[in-house]
Amino acid sequence: GVFAGTDSQRFHDLQEALNNPEVRAIFCARGGYGSIRIVGDLDFSQFIQSPKWIVGFSDITALHARVYNAGFMSIHAAMPKNFDKVDVESLDSLYAMLFGISNGLLESNSVYNKIGNTRGTLVGGNLSVLYSMRAVPFEYSYANAILCIEDLNEYRYHIDRMMQNLKASGVLASLSGLVVGEMLDMKQGADPHKYEVEEIILDAVKDYSYPVCF
């Protein structure tokens, strides 16, 4: 099926891991879809007493937002299903973050970068999930934040629509910076979009002075 179990089963398994003081980190096995169906009901009262790293990306963005609203950090990074496809540098970065060796940041030399200096809380995740979470109670606070986005297997015009939504709703104007992660396997629709994904994103933030990193 689409999910690894029923909503009840998945909720109770995750809640048990959040509550367990002996658990130091929770690695979500894979992305896809389904976290939004259970994360709103999670209880973080015991998690606050024994916080732990939560690791994942894509669909796990909704869980990251819940952790953020509980006042804690989490790690947007590779999951076990993808470990065999992830480069060593990224895995080393994940290890460094988990064990406090470094902040895990990687350098970028993209020609699309908009150079500058900024400060802010790093928030974000999968663009499609962020778009779907607009106005939910556990949506991120974007004021003076550095937003990080990534996505997979989307049409270019979908990326444009989501970025324009974030612009129209004031999210992009409130940021202090934007980091664009991997935008993999982007597709063209029946009417091909003439711009690259990077150009679509830069067009959405062209009115703002903050730096953009690809």
Residue ranges and their predicted role:
Residues 72-135:
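Conserved anion/nucleotide-ligand pocket segment
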Residues 44-66, 73-79, 207-211:
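Short, acidic/small-residue loops that bind anionic groups at enzyme active sites
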Residues 30-33, 154, 183-184:
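Short glycine-rich anion-binding loops that position phosphate/pyrophosphate groups of nucleotides
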Residues 25-27, 55, 146-148, 179:
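Structural motif
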Residues 164-214:
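C-terminal active-site/capping subdomain that shapes the small-molecule cofactor and substrate pocket
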Residues 27-36, 57:
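N-terminal glycine-rich "phosphate-gripper" loop used for MgATP/nucleotide binding
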